[in-house]
Amino acid sequence: MKGDRLIVALDTPSQEQALEWVDSLPQVLWWKVGLELFTAAGSSILQALKERGKRIFLDLKLHDIPHTVGRATEVAVGYGVDLLTVHAAGGSAMLRSAVAAAQGSSCRLLAVTLLTSISPPQVRQELGIEMDPADYVLHLARLAQAQGFTGLVCSPQEVSRLRQALGPEVLLVTPGIRLGQAKAGDGDEDQQRICTPDEALRAGADYLVVGRPITASPDPVAALRRFQALWDAAS
């Protein structure tokens, strides 16, 4: 498995627990810090990861008025993170504000299209969007690309279409990765649009984001090896 293409999500409010996972899986280069951990630990978790030589995906899904998102982006890239998420649904002005704030930094902005926790029926029934989910994702992806975004977060089910439509230069980061034992909506499974690592890679994903299937496993090292086997099979 290419360790620089796997991003492990630190889904915990505890910095101590997060760093225990990081230290127990030294072969993993990329780590995702989301709202839960960032709200609990603040920038100290980012500093701890940088001290360990890790690369950081700060997944805050910024979505506010353009001025606020621009200022928040400026602060976030100042932490030295490598990837930062912004909601594409915030509109063109908001997206441009984020791009302007990140200009000159080494941070790459990723536009979030449609959360992988949202099922196709919810798109119409709850969001009121009279589009096929795949069409809606492509619409938001093109909107973000037109404002200067060069990376996207999308479900594995949309990777192939986005790759074909947007070309090889767009960075596609894919959550909703499972080993196959979890079904959408089962138990504490939030993700609705999921697939296995080999399926996502064959579809054209650049990075895979995996959280609980590794960190909540009784043996995270063994779980990582299982992902490695599927990854190698897709290579």
From Swiss-Prot:
The active site is at K61. Its EC number is 4.1.1.23. This is Orotidine 5'-phosphate decarboxylase. Substrate binds at residues 11, 32, 59-68, 116, 178, 191, 211-212. Pathway: Pyrimidine metabolism; UMP biosynthesis via de novo pathway; UMP from orotate: step 2/2. The gene is pyrF. Transmembrane segments: none annotated. One of its GO terms (biological process) is 'de novo' pyrimidine nucleobase biosynthetic process.
